[in-house]
Each structure stands twice: as structure tokens, then as C-alpha cells.
Amino acid sequence: KEPDSGDFLINYGSCAGRKNIPVGTVSLCNKLTQTVDGRTFYPDILYRHPFEEAELYSFPAVQDRESFQQFLDKDAGAGDRRKEILVDMEAAAIYQAGNYYYAPHQMLFLKVVTDHGTTQEPQSAGSGEHFSQIMDRAAEEVLTFIRQLLTMQEKNSRQESMQEAFRSQVEEQAKLWQEALHGSETMKAQIRQMSLY
């Protein structure tokens, strides 16, 4: 089934963030860059939201702390240390796939900072549980936002339905006036325009 104008593609996932971004922070990504070829994508953010906005860079492999820091120093925002920079592995690819079906304002990329670049050491026994706790805490805030979006979309759908019903009535009335006055198509269009506006 093709998505409707009220449907959304939401990518909710984990990412690494610059050290100035606390673990557990939820960010809405306003710029996605695919590091392999440098292509950049801009999801339209047309909705009020409680999140920080950030740039996200998608790498083809996991970034350890050293390579992540080199990337930050060399490429991403080296001049502005306060800039919110995130890295993941999938957002740019999801945007490109979603772009076939969704408009830029229908795609949201919500990322939770779970680390500041991985370490080379093997993961500790509790690290999976710690990751789940971070994502679960962030999910509450994200779900609240998604519920607000859905409420807004339902309201917009009802308004669109009412407008469509009104337009249909106006069209019928314009046709009746055209027939009664033996008017042309141009006259019918003028009657329709005067009724609508």
C-alpha cells in the first residue's frame, strides 16, 4: 500500500555523539550526510518538537573513539565545538529509500546518544542492559512526541475531509446555476470561485 500524505517514516535509533552531548539525549536530525560519497540530505522539520536538532553522519562501519575524534577534528564542525554532531550507520540510507515513497517533511530521524564512539575493549556483561535502559528512557519522550504528531495529523485529516465535502457541494451548486442560467464552463468556474472564496 502506498503511504498517504498523513503517514510518516520515523527512524528511531541509537548513535554516537560528540562528548558535549550527554548520553541519553534525543536529537532530531536536520541534516544527514552519507560519508562514503558526501551526499547530504535535509529532512524538512515542519513540526514543533522538544528535541535538540543535530547533524548526523552515516558511516559504513562502527566508529571507535579515536576515528570518531579524528573525524570531528578534521571534517565535521572542526571550527565550532558546540555544534551537535552525531554518527550512525543507517540514517542516510533510510532517507534515500524512504524518499521514493515519502516527502522530506514525512521523514523524521530521532537519534539517542548511547556513546561517544565505541571502545576497542570487549563489551562488558551489562552493556546490553545499559543500552536498553538508555533507549527505554528516551522512548517515553519520543512516544509523547509521536502521539502529538498523530493527533495533529488526525485533526488535519478531518479538516481536509470537511473541506473536500464543502468543495463537492460548491461544485454541485455551480453546476445547477450553470444549467439554470444556460451558462458556459467559464461562468460555472466563476460561480465556483465566488462561492469558495
State the predicted function of each range.
Residues 1-197:
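Glycine-rich phosphate- or other oxyanion-binding loops that anchor nucleotides, phosphorylated ligands
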